[in-house]
Amino acid sequence: VANNQSEKTLLRQCPRNSELLQQQRQLGDQTASSTLQLSANKQGGALLLIFVKSGASCFEQLQMAAKLWKIAADHRAERIALSTHGFDSIESHALLNSLLAAVLAGSAALPTYKSKHTTQPLKVISLQQGSANDFATTLATHAGNHLARWLTTLPPNVLDCGNYRHTLQQLAKQESWQAEFLTLAALKKHKADAFLAVARANAHSNAGIMRLRYHSKTNKRKQRHTLALVGKGICFDTGGINLKPHKSMVDMHTDMQGSAVALGTLLALSRLKVPFDIECWLALTENEIGPNAYRPQEVITAANGVTIQVVHSDAEGRMALADTLTLAARNNPNLILDFATLTGACVGALTERMSGAFSNRPQLRDAIELAGRNSGERVWSFPMDSDFDSDLDSPIADIMQCTMDGKGDHILAARFLNRFVPETIPWIHIDLSSGSKTGGLAHIPTEITGFGVRWAVDFFKQHSFN
């Protein structure tokens, strides 16, 4: 309900108008939620209200929508009708999409292994106006986000590299994508020794890089445009030789969330039938400890010939991504976008509320941050000035993997990855500092947020490859 409409308008438009009018007088210009029981409903229904100031940001809309969903979930609602009053058509449509996104995210089941568990009874969602086509973007985005959260929630003994590969192949068949898995033997032929170094201590030989391809039927250009998505898929990260302490290791089954977000983005964009081709490259491995584990001070040659001085085995994500980015770039895509839960430094800089963005094209910065505001998945762009490279100068190799002191590691990690993307290809790197947040984020009620899918869908609504 808009909190800036006249009492006369409120009385005319809204059900239970006298109670609503009293609420509005009490609230003034505040934004708040309220619940009124509908005694006329024999099934014990409820009217759930939120008073919204005009001009609320998308993030604020999603937050408020999540509050309404929580009340509905507590009522064990089987049917929900979503409606807005007092807004113009543009604001009303945006609010309805926020409400729908919150209901879908809140009611979506995630993996559970409890012997007894309850499920949400929601069966029907009704919308006051519009057709399914008006909400196609929200539905496709939810499908991608739910997939990302589902995969990231799975225990590491369930989603190991082999099972992940099988799941991806099944999904590719379902969605009519092409699928190719580069095994360790194939990667050896590609001289992808940075990736292979991380995989050396794995108990099984099931690591590799999955390549999924969506071929747009509406891409009629002679020069077809292609987006390359890249995701970090470390199915479990012990830290390697530089072993993590327990507190830092306990949730490291989620270190593959970058790959899940890249996959969810592929799912959302392909279901929206975007007019460009997509290649999705997922780096799937574990980072284990053992006699074959890679060690500090090794010098490793990546697939593009760049030599790397290893400093810390727990900086494995940038090693696996180095070769994956190199392979993705060989097909000369129009843009490379990678997602990774890469650095604690980015969390330190932004907390878990936002994610960090980096690009080799400064002119993309405004569009990157605009997509964050429009989608409610907020990102902040960090500097990519070339003088940061001096911190990664190595006495024995082309580049150091990282520094010992960790200062600005989110920026240095991006500068490291930049060495594996040709200057001719635009590239965006998202460091997923908001991949997990206690209590959820915006409309997502779970700690694992699947952050990035909504942002990417909005970014490619506005981005032109021309």
Q: Where are these predicted regions, by residue range?
A:
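A generic structural signal for tightly packed, nonpolar segments enriched in small/aliphatic residues
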Residues: 28, 162-466
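Short amphipathic alpha-helical segment within the helicase RecA-like ATPase core
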Residues: 1-233
